[in-house]
A protein has these predicted regions:
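Domain-core detector
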Residues: 1-81, 87-104, 122, 127, ...
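Functional cores of ribonucleases/endoribonucleases
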Residues: 41-49, 54-60, 128-204
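Conserved hydrophobic ligand-interaction patch in extracellular adhesion modules
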Residues: 117
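Second-shell loop/turn segments in exported
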Residues: 108-114, 187
Length: 204
């Protein structure tokens, strides 16, 4: 299958300084983030056209990740008018998956095997008086929330015997939490999402 749904230029060999100049960094209320992305050689994912014509089955499958050499049992098209594709997902070099560069969670997990010091657990947040719906920064300035184990209930992240997924917030600096998260496994896989687990980027 051709990777027609990946409309990115390969940037793995581009100097980091040059890559950063093309990165969209906006801190604050506007939480849009577009990291410099290449094409994954390890993972592919299901891509669905989201409009009024989309069916439940296609919408549910959107974003599911498969190994590049994996055979998909129920591959698209699922029906006569299906417009879904399975193609190579985007990859991002560690240090570009968040707005914080080498201080970001993607860099720290990739090269240190843990979150940065500024991540705080829910238990610690509540101990500081945090109430749901309130701005986290009011209770933990300059910190982000570590969510603990991510259940992967929809099975969109790759599964394997003994694999456990974890999650943490990224990229918010004021106001409410945004839709950006990082997820990583106990066996070395790292992905980021900027739309609350609908689609992912591989961190390499």
């Amino acid at each position: 299958m051709q990777n027609s749904c990946v409309r990115v230029k390969e940037k793995r060999k581009m100097p980091i300084q040059k890559m950063m100049r093309g990165t969209i960094l906006r801190k604050g209320k506007n939480d849009f983030y577009a990291p410099p992305a290449g094409q994954s050689y390890r993972w592919k994912h299901w891509v669905t056209e989201h409009d009024i014509k989309v069916c439940v089955a296609c919408k549910t499958a959107h974003g599911k990740i498969y190994a590049m050499d994996e055979t998909v049992d129920a591959a698209p098209p699922l029906h006569f008018n299906c417009r879904c594709e399975i193609c190579a997902m985007n990859s991002v070099i560690a240090g570009f998956g968040t707005k914080d560069g080498t201080d970001g969670a993607d860099w720290w997990i990739k090269y240190n095997g843990r979150l940065p010091e500024y991540d705080i657990s829910w238990e610690e947040m509540y101990a500081r008086g945090y109430k749901p719906g309130k701005p986290p920064r009011k209770y933990a300035p300059d910190m982000m929330i570590y969510g603990g184990v991510y259940s992967n209930d929809n099975g969109h992240l790759p599964s394997a015997p003994g694999r456990v997924w974890y999650e943490a917030d990224i990229n918010y600096y004021e106001g409410q939490r945004n839709r950006h998260r990082i997820v990583w496994s106990n066996d070395g896989l790292i992905f980021v999402t900027y739309d609350h687990y609908e689609t992912f980027y591989e961190i390499i």
